Each structure stands twice: as structure tokens, then as C-alpha cells.
Amino acid sequence: MPAIQPPLYLTFLLLILLYLIITLYVWTILTITYKTTVRYAALYQRSFSRWGFDQSL
């Protein structure tokens, strides 16, 4: 009797599931990083423009 192998569709299903999990994980991290970066950039820009305005006066 040959070694029991899982059906091919099950393997593909597992791979697709793994791919989806990884994609979702990466997408979440990138979104959070992007939002944080944009927020900090806006804060820095605001403080920098205010500082520049104060210096010009």
C-alpha cells in the first residue's frame, strides 16, 4: 500500500489560504505604516511651516 497522500485540491486549498493570510497580513501592516507616516508627515509639515512663518516675521 502506497503512502497516503492528501488530495491535490486540498493542497491547493491550503496554499491559497496561506497566500490569502500572508497578503492580508502584509496589506494591514502597509496600511498602518502608511497612515502613521502620513499623520507624522502632516504634523511635521505643520510645525515646520509655522516655524518658517515665525522666522519670516
Swiss-Prot record:
Residues 30-57 are intravirion. InterPro entries: SH (IPR001477). It is a single-pass membrane protein. It is found in: Virion membrane; Host cell membrane. Residues 1-8 are virion surface. One of its GO terms (biological process) is symbiont-mediated suppression of host NF-kappaB cascade. GO terms for cellular component: host cell plasma membrane; membrane; virion membrane. The keyword Transmembrane applies. Its main location: virion. Keywords: Host cell membrane, Host membrane, Host-virus interaction, Inhibition of host NF-kappa-B by virus, Membrane, Transmembrane, Transmembrane helix, Virion. Coiled coil: none annotated. Interacts with host TNFRSF1A, RIPK1 and IRAK1; these interactions interfere with host NF-kappa-B activation at the level of receptor complexes. Interacts with host protein UBQLN4. This is Small hydrophobic protein. It comes from Mumps virus (strain Kilham). The lineage of its organism: Viruses, Riboviria, Orthornavirae, Negarnaviricota, Haploviricotina.
